[in-house]
Amino acid sequence: MAQQRRGGFKRRKKVDYIAANKIEYVDYKDTELLSRFVSERGKILPRRVTGTSAKNQRKVTTAIKRARVMALMPFVNED
């Protein structure tokens, strides 16, 4: 049986960064924006982590994949 947490800790609602900043087109050349949605290892972060909507997550995903093909972003970041 799962135990309930005690205390007043309340999880903060994640805000869709793209919708909040009114970005209509996610450009694949804007690697600074796209790097917010990629992990340290180079993997695309899921919606539950970034807080983006489904529509904007699809835009981000296609932009990241285009940037990878154009060699603007790495497929894998091995440090």
UniProtKB/Swiss-Prot annotation:
UniProt key word Signal = no
Alphabetically, the GO molecular function entries are:
small ribosomal subunit rRNA binding; structural constituent of ribosome
Q: Name one GO biological process term.
A: translation
Disulfide linkages recorded for this protein, renumbered to the chain, are: none
Listed A to Z, the keywords are: Ribonucleoprotein, Ribosomal protein, RNA-binding, rRNA-binding
Q: Which GO terms describe its cellular component?
A: cytosolic small ribosomal subunit
Subunit annotation: Part of the 30S ribosomal subunit. Forms a tight heterodimer with protein bS6.
Protein's job: Binds as a heterodimer with protein bS6 to the central domain of the 16S rRNA, where it helps stabilize the platform of the 30S subunit.
Q: Give the UniProt family note.
A: Belongs to the bacterial ribosomal protein bS18 family.
Q: Which NCBIfam families match?
A: S18
Q: What is this protein called?
A: Small ribosomal subunit protein bS18
Species this chain originates from: Streptococcus sanguinis (strain SK36)
Q: What taxonomic lineage is listed for the species of origin?
A: Bacteria, Bacillati, Bacillota, Bacilli, Lactobacillales
Q: Gene behind this chain?
A: rpsR
